[in-house]
């Protein structure tokens, strides 16, 4: 039986696109820091990383799609923070950004990672941006490396 498993060490360079939402930038900058830390620790060079900032989480899927279609990247990491407020806006944004990123992932030949926090309050977002619940930007970048290597292994 043949088993495929992604690795965190790559024989070939990996080019990563990162899409960051500027809304809740205080949180998103921590997610980006985590993602860049993960990539650096796994020998991804700065020249192989491109970061694009969009106004908010709702705009992430469009730019993720443009990056994926450009064929310049092996993976795209999407980072944002949607925090519940007192209106239903949160529900709509969460649903659409989730669907949008999933659609980009399914309709492109590269991994598109979901690193968008969807939290009830600012405390939960802070916890997931580098404190007691880890850093979801770091986790998303690690998953991107693993998925790129898994795809390369399957396509050998």
From Swiss-Prot:
<keyword id="KW-0808">Transferase</keyword>
<dbReference type="GO" id="GO:0009231">
    <property type="term" value="P:riboflavin biosynthetic process"/>
</dbReference>
<dbReference type="GO" id="GO:0005829">
    <property type="term" value="C:cytosol"/>
</dbReference>
<feature type="binding site">
    <location>
        <begin position="57"/>
        <end position="59"/>
    </location>
    <ligand>
        <name>5-amino-6-(D-ribitylamino)uracil</name>
    </ligand>
</feature>
<feature type="binding site">
    <location>
        <position position="128"/>
    </location>
    <ligand>
        <name>(2S)-2-hydroxy-3-oxobutyl phosphate</name>
    </ligand>
</feature>
<dbReference type="InterPro" id="IPR002180">
    <property type="entry name" value="LS/RS"/>
</dbReference>
<feature type="binding site">
    <location>
        <begin position="81"/>
        <end position="83"/>
    </location>
    <ligand>
        <name>5-amino-6-(D-ribitylamino)uracil</name>
    </ligand>
</feature>
<dbReference type="Pfam" id="PF00885">
    <property type="entry name" value="DMRL_synthase"/>
</dbReference>
<feature type="binding site">
    <location>
        <begin position="86"/>
        <end position="87"/>
    </location>
    <ligand>
        <name>(2S)-2-hydroxy-3-oxobutyl phosphate</name>
    </ligand>
</feature>
<dbReference type="GO" id="GO:0000906">
    <property type="term" value="F:6,7-dimethyl-8-ribityllumazine synthase activity"/>
</dbReference>
<comment type="similarity">
    <text>Belongs to the DMRL synthase family.</text>
</comment>
<feature type="binding site">
    <location>
        <position position="23"/>
    </location>
    <ligand>
        <name>5-amino-6-(D-ribitylamino)uracil</name>
    </ligand>
</feature>
<keyword id="KW-0686">Riboflavin biosynthesis</keyword>
<protein>
    <recommendedName>
        <fullName>6,7-dimethyl-8-ribityllumazine synthase</fullName>
        <ecNumber>2.5.1.78</ecNumber>
    </recommendedName>
</protein>
<comment type="function">
    <text>Catalyzes the formation of 6,7-dimethyl-8-ribityllumazine by condensation of 5-amino-6-(D-ribitylamino)uracil with 3,4-dihydroxy-2-butanone 4-phosphate. This is the penultimate step in the biosynthesis of riboflavin.</text>
</comment>
<comment type="pathway">
    <text>Cofactor biosynthesis; riboflavin biosynthesis; riboflavin from 2-hydroxy-3-oxobutyl phosphate and 5-amino-6-(D-ribitylamino)uracil: step 1/2.</text>
</comment>
<feature type="active site" description="Proton donor">
    <location>
        <position position="89"/>
    </location>
</feature>
<feature type="binding site">
    <location>
        <position position="114"/>
    </location>
    <ligand>
        <name>5-amino-6-(D-ribitylamino)uracil</name>
    </ligand>
</feature>
<dbReference type="GO" id="GO:0009349">
    <property type="term" value="C:riboflavin synthase complex"/>
</dbReference>
<dbReference type="InterPro" id="IPR036467">
    <property type="entry name" value="LS/RS_sf"/>
</dbReference>
<dbReference type="InterPro" id="IPR034964">
    <property type="entry name" value="LS"/>
</dbReference>
